[in-house]
């Protein structure tokens, strides 16, 4: 039993040492179009309305992670968008599977999940309304990686994300109750950047 346990530990240690881990950091530009919708209800006067729209913005995206055995890439990324008085911060955990085309060129496909935070001050006929909401964001991405040098890599990709982010604000104005709901739906993104592999 002791020899079996020792052999198992030795095999585990050998496997861990054999794992090729290559840390990296990256920076790039991401262009995102975010779709959202909302509704307004004033029950006291029988009024209700709904709307949908989209905002587009370009943001600096930062990421850090590691490539495991030249095949699996894990990373954390952060981006902040600002448009029409709204701030959107997105923090993601990303996984990519790499498909080598040749020694310098890889394609990848993967998934991401994390948190999105949305803040906006809206001026309305009843005064300023503060929208502050956060929740889950998740989705899929595809892209390509090209080695410029041994350590410097060019990356370009596309991503699609869904959001579980909404907020409902209720109040009373001139004795009349109202309710305002805002909800993030989905987004599409295009990214290009540079990674440094250690």
Please annotate each region the language model reported.
Residues 60-125, 129-138, 146-148, 188-198:
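Gram-negative (and chloroplast) outer-membrane scaffold detector with strong preference
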Residues 149-198:
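Predominantly the C-terminal beta-signal and adjacent terminal strand-loop region
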Residues 19-33:
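Transmembrane beta-strand segments of Gram-negative outer membrane beta-barrel proteins
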Residues 6, 78-80, 158:
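A mature extracytoplasmic/lumenal domain signature
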Residues 1-22:
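Cleavable N-terminal export/targeting peptides
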Residues 33-54, 74-91, 115-134, 164-185:
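Flexible, solvent-exposed loop segments that connect beta-strands
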């Amino acid at each position: 039993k002791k020899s079996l346990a020792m052999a198992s530990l030795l095999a585990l240690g050998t496997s861990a040492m054999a794992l090729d881990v290559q840390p990296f950091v990256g920076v790039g530009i991401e262009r995102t179009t975010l779709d959202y919708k909302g509704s307004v209800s004033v029950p006291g006067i029988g009024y209700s309305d709904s709307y949908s729209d989209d905002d587009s913005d370009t943001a600096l995206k930062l990421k850090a992670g590691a490539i495991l055995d030249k095949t699996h890439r894990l990373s954390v990324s952060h981006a902040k968008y600002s448009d029409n008085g709204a701030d959107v911060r997105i923090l993601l955990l990303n996984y990519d599977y790499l498909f080598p085309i040749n020694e310098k060129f890889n394609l990848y496909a993967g998934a991401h999940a994390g948190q999105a935070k949305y803040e906006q001050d809206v001026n309305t006929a009843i005064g300023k309304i503060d929208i502050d909401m956060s929740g889950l964001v998740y989705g899929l991405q595809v892209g390509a990686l090209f080695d410029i040098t041994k350590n410097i890599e060019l990356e370009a990709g596309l991503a699609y994300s869904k959001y579980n982010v909404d907020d409902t604000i209720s109040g009373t104005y001139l004795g009349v109750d109202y309710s305002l709901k805002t909800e993030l739906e989905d987004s599409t993104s295009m990214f290009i950047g540079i990674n440094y592999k250690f």
